[in-house]
Amino acid sequence: MATDAAEKANILAEALPYIREFAGKTIVIKYGGNAMTDDALKEGFAKDVVLLKLVGMNPVVVHGGGPQINDLLARVGKQGEFIQGMRVTDAETMEVVEMVLGGLVNKEIVSLINKHGGKAVGLTGKDGHFIRARKLFLKTDGDEDVDIGQVGEIEAIDPALVSLLDSQDFIPVVAPIGVGVDGEAYNINADLVAGKLAETLRAEKLVLMTNTPGVLDKQGQLLTGLTAQRIDELFADGTISGGMLPKISSALDAARNGVNSVHVIDGRVKHALLLEILTAAGVGTMIRA
């Protein structure tokens, strides 16, 4: 018992330099994957976020919800379709996306954080029009436009609402839904929202939680550190593809635009968030410009 207590005290003491370094800093966290579907991991994530807030950091959560969207689409007889890692979103699918992301998933995360002593507030980009978007067209190899429905790209993010919540000790929980000039809702990739929000808020860190140990090479080995040049090479040779494309593109843009460090971590590891931010070892892949 005494040994266990001493070990816990040592862990807290080792975290002190990181707590001091990041006090008052903004940490944007993209929350997704298995960490959102496993009950123990969900509880652990909520506790981690509350702890970061209590020790003086400003965590901002941006969440996905792909599996939950797929489940509801299946229940209404629709099958999800993806092109270049982006969900094709017709009007009916957009209704499901708003119900799942802005309602079910967002409110569950808010409730879990509040259950563990935080003060979380759920938002979509339609609140205060703080995520302004326009219709996204993908490009074919022949440079032709591909219409994927109500999928948006970010025009601008107004940081005032999130900054206000941070300053009043609330924890913003953001669903990746943007709004056009005509009030049209747009489904936006959550990794892109997290990256652009981190840039706009001048965040110290952007943490992207995934279902892999981090960025892997073609042999399945973890790449613990990546530069912009190396990422360009991995794009070119196809090592980074599919759903990882928007994730790593967002990470690289954030690193190039003022976010001090970006981390792609394994959300299947309990307390991965604390391991990354409050220990020397860290986990996953660190990306710098």
UniProtKB/Swiss-Prot annotation:
<dbReference type="InterPro" id="IPR041727">
    <property type="entry name" value="NAGK-C"/>
</dbReference>
<dbReference type="InterPro" id="IPR037528">
    <property type="entry name" value="ArgB"/>
</dbReference>
<feature type="binding site">
    <location>
        <position position="87"/>
    </location>
    <ligand>
        <name>substrate</name>
    </ligand>
</feature>
<dbReference type="InterPro" id="IPR036393">
    <property type="entry name" value="AceGlu_kinase-like_sf"/>
</dbReference>
<keyword id="KW-0055">Arginine biosynthesis</keyword>
<dbReference type="GO" id="GO:0042450">
    <property type="term" value="P:arginine biosynthetic process via ornithine"/>
</dbReference>
<keyword id="KW-0808">Transferase</keyword>
<dbReference type="Pfam" id="PF00696">
    <property type="entry name" value="AA_kinase"/>
</dbReference>
<keyword id="KW-0028">Amino-acid biosynthesis</keyword>
<dbReference type="GO" id="GO:0005524">
    <property type="term" value="F:ATP binding"/>
</dbReference>
<comment type="pathway">
    <text>Amino-acid biosynthesis; L-arginine biosynthesis; N(2)-acetyl-L-ornithine from L-glutamate: step 2/4.</text>
</comment>
<keyword id="KW-0547">Nucleotide-binding</keyword>
<dbReference type="GO" id="GO:0003991">
    <property type="term" value="F:acetylglutamate kinase activity"/>
</dbReference>
<keyword id="KW-0418">Kinase</keyword>
<keyword id="KW-0067">ATP-binding</keyword>
<keyword id="KW-0963">Cytoplasm</keyword>
<comment type="function">
    <text>Catalyzes the ATP-dependent phosphorylation of N-acetyl-L-glutamate.</text>
</comment>
<feature type="binding site">
    <location>
        <position position="187"/>
    </location>
    <ligand>
        <name>substrate</name>
    </ligand>
</feature>
<feature type="site" description="Transition state stabilizer">
    <location>
        <position position="247"/>
    </location>
</feature>
<protein>
    <recommendedName>
        <fullName>Acetylglutamate kinase</fullName>
        <ecNumber>2.7.2.8</ecNumber>
    </recommendedName>
</protein>
<feature type="site" description="Transition state stabilizer">
    <location>
        <position position="30"/>
    </location>
</feature>
<dbReference type="InterPro" id="IPR001057">
    <property type="entry name" value="Glu/AcGlu_kinase"/>
</dbReference>
<dbReference type="InterPro" id="IPR001048">
    <property type="entry name" value="Asp/Glu/Uridylate_kinase"/>
</dbReference>
<dbReference type="InterPro" id="IPR004662">
    <property type="entry name" value="AcgluKinase_fam"/>
</dbReference>
<dbReference type="GO" id="GO:0005737">
    <property type="term" value="C:cytoplasm"/>
</dbReference>
<feature type="binding site">
    <location>
        <begin position="65"/>
        <end position="66"/>
    </location>
    <ligand>
        <name>substrate</name>
    </ligand>
</feature>
<dbReference type="GO" id="GO:0006526">
    <property type="term" value="P:L-arginine biosynthetic process"/>
</dbReference>
<comment type="similarity">
    <text>Belongs to the acetylglutamate kinase family. ArgB subfamily.</text>
</comment>
